[in-house]
């Protein structure tokens, strides 16, 4: 124990050990609270889905002075991107905005969609029958048809899954039908279909919105997640599931989404099984089934009773001596087969190298998850002892830092497998450049791995049984290592983003930025709305005055909003307490089966 705690023998990767000790007497120096700024990730439940949708509808309705179904049509067309909708309005004008989305507004339009309140007979251009005027319905585009034809048209479109954009029946008319009219006509004959129509419109806020996605939990929790800033992020739903918002897979940074999808398939499909069969077996020349040699003799007999030479794979007779095999002599060296076999062996060995280390850290994470209860017990016992040290938050902070850094370390191996292999970037880097980058990355990875293991070791120490001096030494080591692994994780991400992926021509391999506080937990949408109303801040980000000027002048305006995304409202978190780091275990450790 004393050897492990010797400061002279430990060589931690940190720019200045003394700097990390300056605040030792104050545990706030290592307590890493969740950021006090407004939460940028919201969880939308079934109850708050309608409120979330109405928030965007209200903004468009107020700024454009249009009905709700017109605002919905515009938002669906622009995938519920309010800022993009406003930008098109400023750049191209109101007419272009409406025509592109299929919205038609008639001057002096009556609120009543019926053609006439009288019983005078009028002809329907679809069924070519004369019906009373009150049985004809006119849409915003001015086209009118009988209610039976409209109802049949709406029924077909809803059943075909086109509820979000039901266009007028008139020839070459692309106007979107009024959802109130659709609902009113369909509900008279098929109330269930009307409910289906409303459900499609409601879920459009999630299905068509790139900033909102369903939680991929199984069984489904019923929640959706909305992000305010960048869709390239990792989030945690209120149900506890952590996932990548970009691809809806488990959180996998520093792997890109493409890398993780390839790795996941490689681990679960039969690709490596095929490699093993290629390396360790040979096909029978008669039945073509793979045969594994279980002895030293090169004359092999398949279950189908066919004998063949193990060296070249050619069929032979069954008799042989030490000098020759009956009916066979090996031919010339076949270079292609040998190269193929050697390549398969090399690829299998390389895959097993990265997979074994990835799996080892995943297994370590599962074992370290049990440390949470042990740490709590040791802290509880230590607080009851008469020790000089009264605050043991350093142990909890160190445990959370261990979980976070172990997750990063686990997924760094799949990243390295594809980054320095031939599958993705063979033509992007020369062999010399690949070697330099690989050495740079592996140095970072090795330093992180060494410090993570040291941190894990010190947290497992029974400090609840030690005297004051040893507890203080463990505390210093845990604090130093917590700072060190956080710095190393940040450096690794910077290395990946700038030195590795940043120099490549392909821009599809983006990674989620490193968050020292861990994966962001989604806050409730209702609470954020209440906070917004309490603060009384506008979420229009300056668009209102600019749009008024654009609509009045009718000219395009080259301006930009101070926020490229939805505006955020700062919250004080007055009723919340300062919390510690997120308990970010690898997804395998928290995956619901």
Swiss-Prot record:
Zn(2+) 3 binds at residues 215, 221, 237, 239. A zinc finger (RING-type) spans 124-173, 284-312. Keywords: Metal-binding, Repeat, Transferase, Ubl conjugation pathway, Zinc, Zinc-finger. A zinc finger (IBR-type) spans 195-257. Zn(2+) 6 binds at residues 309, 312, 320, 330. Zn(2+) 1 binds at residues 124, 127, 146, 149. It comes from the Eukaryota. Ubiquitous. It catalyses: [E2 ubiquitin-conjugating enzyme]-S-ubiquitinyl-L-cysteine + [acceptor protein]-L-lysine = [E2 ubiquitin-conjugating enzyme]-L-cysteine + [acceptor protein]-N(6)-ubiquitinyl-L-lysine. One of its GO terms (biological process) is protein ubiquitination. Binds 4 Zn(2+) ions per subunit. Pathway: Protein modification; protein ubiquitination. Residues 120-334 are annotated as: TRIAD supradomain. PROSITE patterns: TRIAD, ZF_RING_2. Zn(2+) 4 binds at residues 244, 247, 252, 257. Gene3D superfamilies: 1.20.120.1750, Zinc/RING finger domain, C3HC4 (zinc finger). Its cofactor is Zn(2+). Belongs to the RBR family. Ariadne subfamily. Might act as an E3 ubiquitin-protein ligase, or as part of E3 complex, which accepts ubiquitin from specific E2 ubiquitin-conjugating enzymes and then transfers it to substrates. Members of the RBR family are atypical E3 ligases. They interact with the E2 conjugating enzyme UBE2L3 and function like HECT-type E3 enzymes: they bind E2s via the first RING-type zinc finger, but require an obligate trans-thiolation step during the ubiquitin transfer, requiring a conserved active site Cys residue in the second RING-type zinc finger. The active site probably forms a thioester intermediate with ubiquitin taken from the active-site cysteine of the E2 before ultimately transferring it to a Lys residue on the substrate. This is Probable E3 ubiquitin-protein ligase ARI2.
